[in-house]
Structures are given as C-alpha cells and as structure tokens.
Amino acid sequence: MAILIVEDNPTNAMIIKHLARKVTHEEIVVETDGGAALALCHGRVFTMLIVDNMLPGMSGLQFVKAVRLMQRYDDVPIVMVTADHEPRLRAEAVATGVTDFLTKPVEAVAFRKLVADHLGGVPADMVAAR
C-alpha cells in the first residue's frame, strides 16, 4: 500500500515525506498538482492522503471533494496540512471529508502521531522515540 502526499512546495513535501517515513514503511508518493493527484487516485487506492490546500490547478478542498466521490476512498483518512489558519477553512475541510487538519509549520511529533494513529501500526510511545 502507499501514502499520497499532494504538496506543490518541494521543501514542505520533503519534510512531510521524511516525517511520515519515521512511522511507516509504506511507499510514499508525492504529487505537486491536484489534477495529477486525482488521476493517480483513479488508478490506485492509497491508504492515506496528505493534502495541502493551496495547489496549482485545483485547491485541496476541490481535490478532497472529488476523491470522496470515489466509493473506494470512503474510509481512507485524508489529512489537510496548510498554512491557512482560518477556522472557516477547517470547518469547510471537515465538511468536505477531511479526516484531520494540521497547520504549517507542521509540529513533528504531532504529525507522526497523527499518521501512526490513522495507519494503526505504531504505538504512540514508539513515535516519540523515532
């Protein structure tokens, strides 16, 4: 199985990928464009989606809405990671189908715990130790 990170900033994508690797051995795929990421989701099922909101082509919210229309993604956790701190965005994201919401800059321990909790494979005490 694999995790899909949809993030157009290469530095942010690298940081998120590095943090996720601390708690999973799953393949991690990075896509910089929402439309291309949506095409990937049509072709395969990811175990988790980590999505920025500000993307070229379509917003993270538009991406989530489109993914949630695919029945095979009904139970797949989607984490939105964005620099936008507006409470309105958080509410809209949850209403759209986002499972969890983190703001940038990402706090490493909280991010690793969130990923581990959703993947169900790494106890919280191991997350802090990695």
Task: Report the location of each language-model feature.
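The feature encodes the CheY-like receiver
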Residues: 56, 86
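Conserved acidic carboxylate
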Residues: 7
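Two-component/phosphorelay signaling modules centered on CheY-like receiver
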Residues: 10-29
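Acidic, metal-coordinating helix/loop segments flanking the phosphotransfer/catalytic sites
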Residues: 30-48
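C-terminal output helix
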Residues: 106-115
